[in-house]
């Protein structure tokens, strides 16, 4: 199946978007409907390292995690929860491990659903194992194991299928260290999109075959890397104005999953999901202030603005004063959702949405671009050339630059360092050709010679 490209927006304007409501809600798991008028907490966790020593230890660890979460949700009176299991390498390299974990988790979830009526679903995020020690091996021997991991998990209890895919990462790592804007465009917007179409066409087939949900991807490997290198307001390893361009380019790349059959909810660490929601109308999971257990960011309230599920990134399972980590963080997420759901019920959702957005809007260029009104503009620039993976990524990057420039003329403060990086990036973008074939040929020649670990055959070249 060829990907069906988006050439129009799902919403007539940005103000139509809010949290807990999507154009195309998703039914999943045990009586859960996502994006259907209420927000849902989605707890994300990691086993302790020693639990990976054997399959039996790993299953026991996930049984404890699942029981702790379900018990706490019922104990405090929350009506719904999604559990996200991000695979450790052993679970994807050995698909039966992931499958047995999924089965063990779902058995516990069914018990709590049957006894207490709590609505719930299980997401499994398969590890992108398509690499060897030296370089990515996206279409090699590991691809069949990668797909088998999806299929076995889907057959054994997972409701939502996701991955944080790595396509383009080898060129991105080279480009981001050199402030190479064409390299960011090529790695995320072009190589990433090519790989996404391959894998999400196959994942969506598995979901259809198994009666599960092809949920979505995230550009964690690239846009989040740029965000992390950028750091906070004291850091100068990477200009935040470059990190935000990487984020804008990641939106058309993450969009490909939905063009190839995914239906949401998009995965939590895709900060670009607000743009994807504006284009597709599909439900999205977001993370922000509740992901401080895993990393800091500069837009912790703002990203709640239009979420359908609200997540915490990931937390290692261990004890805290208030219970285990998964109990503490799932309760925090659920209280945030209770507030959003009350706002929806009392028709104050847009007031709360705008307060969350305004609290971070001018903190950083990354927050400014992801404010829902500006994110909508980036979406419009993408669908304008929706059939061309190069032009739509280039459009997103240039529109991002325009938005930040407009912000800097107002309340958004940029240092000289950030301002110069933005001007240089925009000049580099405007110097690029409009012809996709020329851009792709030029980049293939350049990065094939400069990046030793870049294997064009990974992308069908």
Curated annotation (Swiss-Prot):
Source organism: Methanosarcina barkeri (strain Fusaro / DSM 804)
Gene Ontology MF term list: metal ion binding; methanol-5-hydroxybenzimidazolylcobamide Co-methyltransferase activity
Recorded catalytic activity of this chain's protein: Co(I)-[methanol-specific corrinoid protein] + methanol + H(+) = methyl-Co(III)-[methanol-specific corrinoid protein] + H2O
Keywords annotated in UniProt: Metal-binding, Methyltransferase, Transferase, Zinc
Record bears the keyword 4Fe-4S: no
Pfam families the UniProt entry points to: MtaB
Subunit description: Heterotetramer, composed of 2 MtaB and 2 MtaC subunits.
Protein family per UniProt: Belongs to the MtaB family.
Protein's recorded name: Methanol--corrinoid protein co-methyltransferase
Zinc in keyword set: yes
